[in-house]
Every structure is written in C-alpha cells, then in structure tokens.
C-alpha cells in the first residue's frame, strides 16, 4: 500500500527541477515541490492515505485526528473515514488559520471535547511551522496531542522540530523515497 501511495504521489503530486524554481511557504526556493492535494483528493489516493495514516496511529488510542486547514483537512478526513471502515472510529477536526470571530470563538472545528486524545496530521512538513502551530492551537483548546503524523517529510528538519513538541512524530513517506521512485519512473 505504501509503495502504491509513493508511485501515486510521483505521478500526481511531485515536481522536480534542475534549478531551484519552486517557492515554499518559508519563501525559500527549492528544486523539489510536492502538492499532496491531487493525490489525497483522488478516490484511490484518499483510500491509501486514510489506511496508511490509520496504520500509523492504531496503537495511540485516539479520539480525534486533524490539523491546520487546508493541508491537513483531506488527510484527517481520509483517516477518519478509514477508521470507521476499520471498526475503530476516530473523529476528524480542523484547526482554523484565524480564530472564528462570531458565535463561539474557537480555533478547532469538529466534535472535539476538552481532554480528548488526538493526533495532529499534515500533508507536507519542511520546517514544521504549520504543524507546530496546529499542535499549539489544539493544546490551547484543551486537546491532548498524543501523536503527529506527516504524509510527506521533505527531510529538512521539520519532523525533528515537530518531535520536540510531540515525541511520537512520524512520516508516512520521505523525500528520499519519493526521489528514488521518481528516478525509477523517469528511466
């Protein structure tokens, strides 16, 4: 299943360039760019992501799974759907980029209660900034962040930064795995 996801990502979501031409959130230019949305929002990609994320969190005894909108949303929803299919339902939630300014003011959207155990997910990690923001906001709403799962680790220190806040942090796929598959596909 993991190799199928890697191949799917290479076909739908990964771009490489000889020169640094892809602007990252940090503002830095990179030769490697991955936009996971075309993969995750495809029915087969959603199935693969959901099941692989659930495999990564199955021992954590979670109540919820979510992260910062929009990158984490399809990952969390795929995992929540897969959790129901697997007979161990876990609720999805989304963390706003800006707090809701009307009604009940809050960062977290979804059926989550203070004290519940959650995993924070993200589609891609470079520096870890977005994932760390999600962890901090989830904790500020009283959620216990027990695990962090990243779909693609660019292997630029972000996963290690996340692990400083959530020691149980892991990635489903690494940049090295994508590069290896990309090179095989291009031969």
Swiss-Prot record:
The record, for SUPFAM superfamilies, names: PRTase-like (SSF53271)
Q: Which Gene3D superfamilies match?
A: 3.40.50.2020
Pfam families noted in UniProt: Pribosyltran
Annotated metabolic or biological route of this protein: Pyrimidine metabolism; UMP biosynthesis via de novo pathway; UMP from orotate: step 1/2
Gene Ontology terms, MF aspect: magnesium ion binding; orotate phosphoribosyltransferase activity
Output the GO biological process annotations, alphabetical, semicolon-separated: 'de novo' UMP biosynthetic process; pyrimidine nucleobase biosynthetic process
Catalyses which reaction? Answer: orotidine 5'-phosphate + diphosphate = orotate + 5-phospho-alpha-D-ribose 1-diphosphate
- Is Transferase given among the entry's keywords? yes
Binding-site residues for 5-phospho-alpha-D-ribose 1-diphosphate, renumbered to this chain? 96-97, 100, 102, 122-130
Essential cofactor(s)? Mg(2+)
Keyword line: Glycosyltransferase, Magnesium, Pyrimidine biosynthesis, Transferase
What is the E.C. number?
A: 2.4.2.10
Q: Which residues bind orotate?
A: 126, 154
Q: How does it assemble?
A: Homodimer.
Q: Which NCBIfam families does the UniProt entry name for this protein?
A: pyrE
Q: Which family does it belong to?
A: Belongs to the purine/pyrimidine phosphoribosyltransferase family. PyrE subfamily.
- PANTHER family, sorted: OROTATE PHOSPHORIBOSYLTRANSFERASE, URIDINE 5'-MONOPHOSPHATE SYNTHASE
Q: What's this protein's function?
A: Catalyzes the transfer of a ribosyl phosphate group from 5-phosphoribose 1-diphosphate to orotate, leading to the formation of orotidine monophosphate (OMP).
User: What is the official name of this protein in its record?
Assistant: Orotate phosphoribosyltransferase
Q: Which organism is it from?
A: Desulfatibacillum aliphaticivorans
